[in-house]
A protein has these predicted regions:
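Flexible helix-coil transition and linker loops at the boundaries of alpha-helical arrays
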Residues: 53-57, 88-102, 116, 130, ...
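Short coil loop/turn residues that delineate tetratricopeptide repeat
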Residues: 59, 93-94, 135-137, 168-171, ...
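Residue at a conserved register position within TPR or TPR-like alpha-solenoid repeats
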Residues: 71, 113-114, 148, 188, ...
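TPR alpha-solenoid repeat register
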Residues: 63, 97-98, 105, 140, ...
Length: 307
């Protein structure tokens, strides 16, 4: 784009025919790495071109965003933040809904603010501007929701993360939702945690099961699932034998790997009634070996349970 991006074209200016082959072809571009990136930093290729472009067009908010990228990549967060804010202040009142450049400007600014320890209310001001200009972009909600979950503001975390997933489902990820699209499992796990902490156990269970169907060895998802099954009261929300039946649908308990994984999660949670059912799937010799190899993982108590 302008001085810093290249694009194909015909020498005589004849328009090119463009075809969308993204379903047929998958191309991974690793960007500038190693020696190429070091050379790029040393000679300041992009930086000089962007500065020249801004000299010629001082109000170009897109170039300001690219300049912020250069400083962000170089680790100069103060300059990066300054140029991202300048870019946002110069943006028009209406943006193209697939304006990936402007979305990146907002996204990187929010990330810098989080790195700098800015208050969440300050970040919400930037979020409000971002969501107003690009209402279909899920990444803004994803970032704020993730930060809220990390700050243990689980109730608000639910709102933002649910909204992020809703936008992703409604509007897709073509030229948008780059972050949430590459952190979908973590988003489900964070949302499940927020739901669990706010008493929405049914939603937490459905989210965890969705994760485990595609990533069965997510300890975070399995732990949250079992925690929701056990509940907070004197009696478990789900009876141990019923919980075991669900685990048998998610895991191949004939596999030692799966049995050990489930046993480890149960032991970590501390649900001895369910642990008894799981230990029944091991031979006495296997249990003896597990106790000697991994002390403390399982108790040495009786394996029977009163029917």
């Amino acid at each position: 784009r302008r001085r810093i991006h290249e694009q194909l074209g015909r020498m005589d200016g004849t328009p090119m025919h463009i075809a969308d082959a993204t379903k047929e072809l998958s191309i991974l571009h690793s960007g500038y790495r190693g020696a190429a990136w070091e050379e790029k930093k040393v000679n300041g290729r992009n930086l000089n071109l962007i500065l020249k472009e801004l000299e010629d067009h001082p109000g170009d908010y897109e170039m300001m965003g690219y300049l912020g990228d250069e400083y962000y990549a170089a680790g100069d967060l103060d300059k990066a933040e300054s140029w991202y804010r300048e870019s946002i202040a110069s943006m028009p009142s209406v943006l193209d809904e697939r304006d990936q450049r402007s979305a990146a400007t907002f996204t990187y600014l929010l990330q810098i603010m989080e790195e700098n320890g800015n208050d969440i209310d300050e970040m919400k001001l930037i979020y409000g501007k971002a969501a107003g200009l690009l209402p279909k972009e899920a990444d803004f909600d994803y970032l704020i929701g993730t930060y809220l979950a990390a700050d243990r503001d689980y109730a608000e975390g639910v709102l933002y993360l649910e909204r992020a997933l809703d936008k992703l489902q409604r509007y897709g990820s073509n030229n948008r939702a780059m972050l949430i699209g590459s952190h979908l499992r973590e988003t489900y796990e964070n949302l499940a945690l927020c739901c669990r902490k706010t008493g929405k156990d049914e939603r937490a269970v459905s989210l965890c099961i969705a994760v485990l169907k595609s990533a069965p060895y997510s300890m975070e998802a399995l732990y949250l699932l079992l925690e929701a099954f056990r509940g907070n009261g004197f009696r478990p929300s789900v009876a141990p034998e019923k919980a075991m039946g669900i685990l048998e649908q998610l895991y191949c308990l004939d596999s030692m790997k799966d049995r050990l994984f489930v046993l480890k999660a149960c032991s970590k949670l501390g649900w001895p009634e369910l642990e008894v059912y799981i230990k029944r799937r091991f031979t006495a010799e296997e249990l003896s070996y597990i106790r000697s190899a991994w002390p403390g993982v399982i108790s040495a108590g009786p394996e029977e349970i009163n029917s």
